[in-house]
């Protein structure tokens, strides 16, 4: 048996062990979070509220009606941004790639703010805000890739990053201009733009969960091709990988994940940058193993 096979055999338990530890940490952190707040609630009361809910108990109502929905929103947002960050860094082959830096969050925010300023309501179509945010993120990142691909040399990681920062600044400026000119939109969106989990309900989370799950499914579907893509375009072409299709599917997954996260909690940065590096320390560069771990790490 070769050394490579021995090393791979030794590494196999690591992703499972890491997933188990992350799950336990996530459960413990969630229980602590549900007890924290303006009114401290003991862990045993939190467990009783989750297992044997009594609507007549005031503390249990605080947990189930207020804190639980915020916890679910935080978990969904962190998991979506973590997976999106890992996927983005893999697609563009840049360890500094992050939805906030490359303009996806800014594009999603601009789309939501613009539709609100135009008076378009999301009430008749509950999934409207997540899909609008996803379209905004996808369009702006598509513009980043098109701008970075222009000229000689193609879309190098450095050019993608520079174009992303430039278009992100432009989208943020347009968003600020809309808010300055429309006071009603400013009042409706100012807390959301700062990154806020207050005022959410289960209906909002359910509609945001659909694009997030679709994005995760697409990411897992193209994970084997992304491993080959990480070796370089020439190698990937030689092994029969359709580069355009793979990158478009990756863009679709990233846009859906970012759209779901932004629709719930507003534009939040840094999570998509740090999570991929943490995951790579826990497992290998294999995207098939890293993707399932990016969600709990981001949620934490």
Listing of model-derived features with the role each one plays in the protein:
Residues 2-300:
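Alpha-helical transmembrane segments in inner-membrane proteins
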